[in-house]
Design a protein with these regions (language model features):
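N-terminal beta1-alpha1-beta2 submodule of the flavodoxin-like/Rossmannoid cofactor-binding fold
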Residues: 15, 19-123, 127, 134-136, ...
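Short, glycine-/small-residue-rich phosphate/pyrophosphate-handling segment
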Residues: 155-191
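Short, conserved loop/helix-junction motifs that constitute active-site signature segments
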Residues: 145-151, 175-176
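Short, surface-exposed connector motifs at secondary-structure boundaries
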Residues: 123-125, 150-155, 181
Length: 209
């Protein structure tokens, strides 16, 4: 597979993290937006081949990352897997701000609802998440620690209000030293309407389609 990297990830761009303020709560989580299309609002198990070697795992609070995961699935035929904590997060962004920050400070690993039966069948694994507090939400840390990613090609994608990647790519590299980590795709919340073409260009450059 010929791989061309098209996105340069700038690590540590936000030295103070994506800290929410009274004026800008979107720095913690994505704003909830209308689906780009009916097909982009994909339910788990709705599409994808059972014999695919591509997995698209994602965590989504507002629905934005879910939409982006659906776009990737539509173009790659990969299997979707939602990373869901056993205890759902509140819809109140003020409460969520405090909860998610405390989880990060305490290095919590929230228990997840679903389990992959066999990750060995996948050669390429996309990992999607919003930027929370300059890093991945803690359920994504749980997911990455529960499976053996040795020898896998891992490709991150993120949705964000501010801060883009934060420290998340560094975290993935540290957690998965035996994996090949390719540069990913970052989509700001207001760019979701134009994301399908960006996803297509990105996947073509990576040699995925």
């Amino acid at each position: 597979m010929g791989i061309v990297i098209i996105i340069a990830v700038t690590l540590g761009a936000c030295t103070n993290g994506d800290l929410p303020t009274k004026e800008s709560k979107d720095s913690l989580v994505e704003k909830k937006v209308e689906p780009v299309s009916e097909t982009s609002d994909v339910e788990i198990g709705e599409s994808g081949s059972d014999d695919t070697d591509i997995l698209i795992a994602y965590f989504s609070w507002s629905g934005n990352t879910k939409q982006l995961a659906g776009m990737i699935q539509e173009q790659t035929g990969g299997e979707l897997f939602e990373i869901e904590p056993e205890t759902p997060y509140t819809d109140d962004i003020n409460e969520l701000s405090g909860i998610s920050l405390q989880e990060q400070r305490d290095n919590i690993r929230p228990a997840l609802i679903s389990v992959l039966e066999d990750i060995s069948q996948y050669e390429v694994i996309f990992i999607g998440y919003p930027n929370w507090w300059n890093n991945m939400p803690m359920p994504v840390f749980t997911f990455l620690e529960e499976y053996d990613f040795s020898g896998k090609t891992v490709i991150p994608f993120t949705t964000y209000g501010n801060g883009v990647w934060g420290k998340s790519v560094n975290s993935i590299q540290e957690m998965l030293p035996e994996s090949v980590i390719l540069d990913g795709l970052a989509i700001q919340e207001h760019e979701l309407q134009n994301a399908p073409s960006k996803v297509s260009e990105w996947l073509k450059e990576l040699g995925m389609i």
